[in-house]
Amino acid sequence: MFKHETVLLHETVDMLEVKPDGIYVDATLGGAGHSEYLLNKLNEKGHLFAFDQDQTAIDNAKIKLADYSDKVTFIKANFRDMKEALNERGIEAVDGILYDLGVSSPQLDERERGFSYHQDAALDMRMDQEQELTAKIVVNEWSYQDLIRIFFQYGEEKFSKQIAREIERRREVKPIETTGELVDIIKTAIPAPARRKGGHPGKRTFQAIRIAVNDELGAVEDSLEKALTLLKPGGRISVITFHSLEDRITKHLFQEATKGPDLPPGLPVIPDEYKPDFKLATRKPIVPSEEELEQNNRARSAKLRVIEKIIK
């Protein structure tokens, strides 16, 4: 069964200030926890569009949300294509959008999906099982320099060069097929004292490959930029991030959106067209409570940022 602990459930949805008759988007359906809570706040005129590129997530959500079937539309697509998918359905503007950028726990835990460094499986890591690029292709075919780049940029891995060099050495002998083989390579490449600190030695490398396979950061940036153009005045976007890379992108985009155009010097009054279109609804990110952390350790690195389109 598709089980997933929803992080910052009430905070994320409540910060959208849901209107009962509004149109909302869950950009990352996953285990449907946020969707269920949001649907509960909508009347018969309200509607939710729920996106996921994983068919398993959609199939399970249809069962979980069966009582709300007339209020929800499921769309199998990457959230970077959200605006186009909504426009195709006649939706030009919405009242709120939420993102939970954590990988769904069920995907991490399904052995055959090849996300986990705890279980041996084929190197896969695709969110969308229909796409061609897999972790196996990245590990076996990408250049030494490209591997260093993704391990350093996406994994913030100090031993990027050593790991890339060991991958290169091993794949010359035979293709690297499984997550278990990759874990063994990482453990060989990282010096013993460093291996004993800071959690599993494969964590950063696996994160980097997963981000590369799914172009996660590019998708986040594209999607958020489009999401800002979809908001009605007074509408809000809630974004939960789980690592510094996504949080940096979200923070930067939100800050840029709240600036407004450059002002000509010497204006006594600021004309409306020079006032910003957006304001931050969260000056500092909202983080999980101690109580939530006790129940769900995966929430530890979660941060929630919210932006609002200003009514002029």
UniProtKB/Swiss-Prot annotation:
Any GO molecular function: rRNA (cytosine-N4-)-methyltransferase activity
This protein's record includes keyword rRNA processing: yes
Compartments, record wording: Cytoplasm
Enzyme Commission no: 2.1.1.199
GO aspect biological process, one term: rRNA base methylation
GO cellular component annotations of the record: cytoplasm
SUPFAM superfamilies: Putative methyltransferase TM0872, insert domain (SSF81799), S-adenosyl-L-methionine-dependent methyltransferases (SSF53335)
Residues that coordinate or bind S-adenosyl-L-methionine: A32, G33, H34, D52, F79, D100, Q107
Keywords, sorted A to Z: Cytoplasm, Methyltransferase, rRNA processing, S-adenosyl-L-methionine, Transferase
Catalytic activity: cytidine(1402) in 16S rRNA + S-adenosyl-L-methionine = N(4)-methylcytidine(1402) in 16S rRNA + S-adenosyl-L-homocysteine + H(+)
Principal place of residence: cytoplasm
Function per UniProt: Specifically methylates the N4 position of cytidine in position 1402 (C1402) of 16S rRNA.
Recorded family membership: Belongs to the methyltransferase superfamily. RsmH family.
Protein name: Ribosomal RNA small subunit methyltransferase H
UniProt organism field: Listeria monocytogenes serotype 4b (strain CLIP80459)
Gene name linked to the record: rsmH
